C-alpha cells in the first residue's frame, strides 16, 4: 500500500509503508511514533519522464497488441492488459517512497487490530479492502496530523520501474524473476516477510 503527502516545499512525497523492525506495536508506540518509523524508510525518487503502460518489449502479448494498434485494429477488450495500452509519456515531480510494503506491524499500530489471514508482523498486510485502506489513511492523518494519500498509478509504476535509475530490466530490478519476486507455488501459499529479495534500482523491495 502506497501513501503520499505534500511537504512544506510543495514537493510530492510517496510513502510505501513496510517495516522490518522486530518489535511489537505497543513497544513501537512507546519508543517512537509510527510516522517517525515510516519516514526513516523513505527513499527519494527524482522526478522525470517515462513511458507508462505496456510497450512492445514488455511481453509477447503486448507486442501482438501493439502491432494490432498499428494496423488500426482494436485489441480484445477482455485481454488482461488492454487498459495499459497504448504506452504514453508521463512526467512526474519527485517524491519519497519507502523500500517496503505496508506491514501488519504498521497497520496494527495505527488501527489497533490486524485483519490479515496470515499473521506476521513483518509480512505485508492483506485481506483489506479499498474502504479499509481509506479508513487506515484517515486515522493515520488525524492521529499524527499528516497529509498522506494513496499515490497515482503513474507514481507507483515509475518507482517500480526504477525511476531515472532504471536499467530497463524485464522485472522490477532484474531480468531474473526469482531475484526480485516470490512466484513459485510454495512461496505463494502465504505472504513472505518484506525485504526478502533483491531491491530494484531505487532500493525498493518485493
Map each language-model feature to its residues.
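Bacterial N-terminal signal peptides
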Residues: 12-22
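N-terminal compositionally biased, intrinsically disordered segments and leader/signal-like regions
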Residues: 8-9, 21, 56, 64
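N-terminal secretory signal peptides that target proteins for export/translocation
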Residues: 1-9
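A short glycine-rich, aromatic-capped structural motif
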Residues: 35-115, 129-131
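Boundary at the C-terminal end of the N-terminal hydrophobic targeting segment
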Residues: 25-29
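Residues marking helix boundaries in flexible regions
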Residues: 9-10, 39
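A domain-start/cap signature at the N-terminus of enzymes
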Residues: 31-33
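Functional-site microenvironments in short loops/helix caps that host divalent-cation chemistry
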Residues: 51, 56, 60, 64, ...
Amino acid at each position: 500500500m502506497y501513501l503520499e503527502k505534500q511537504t512544506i516545499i510543495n514537493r510530492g512525497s510517496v510513502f510505501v509503508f513496510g517495516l522490518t523492525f522486530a518489535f511489537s506495536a505497543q513497544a513501537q508506540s512507546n519508543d517512537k511514533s509510527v510516522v517517525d518509523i515510516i519516514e526513516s524508510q523513505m527513499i527519494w525518487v527524482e522526478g522525470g519522464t517515462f513511458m507508462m503502460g505496456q510497450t512492445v518489449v514488455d511481453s509477447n502479448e503486448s507486442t501482438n497488441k501493439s502491432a494490432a494498434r498499428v494496423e488500426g485494429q482494436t485489441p480484445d477488450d477482455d485481454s488482461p492488459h488492454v487498459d495499459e495500452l497504448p504506452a504514453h509519456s508521463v512526467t512526474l515531480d519527485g517524491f519519497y517512497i519507502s523500500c517496503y510494503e505496508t506491514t501488519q506491524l504498521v497497520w496494527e499500530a495505527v488501527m489497533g487490530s490486524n485483519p490479515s489471514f496470515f499473521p506476521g508482523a513483518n509480512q505485508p498486510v492483506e485481506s483489506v479492502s479499498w474502504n479499509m485502506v481509506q479508513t487506515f489513511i484517515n486515522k493515520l492523518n488525524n492521529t499524527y496530523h499528516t497529509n498522506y494519500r494513496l499515490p497515482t498509478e503513474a507514481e507507483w509504476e515509475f518507482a517500480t520501474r526504477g525511476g531515472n535509475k532504471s536499467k530497463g530490466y524485464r522485472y522490477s530490478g532484474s531480468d531474473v524473476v526469482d531475484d526480485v519476486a516470490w512466484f513459485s507455488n510454495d512461496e505463494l501459499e502465504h505472504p513472505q516477510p518484506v525485504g526478502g529479495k533483491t531491491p530494484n534500482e531505487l532500493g525498493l523491495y518485493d
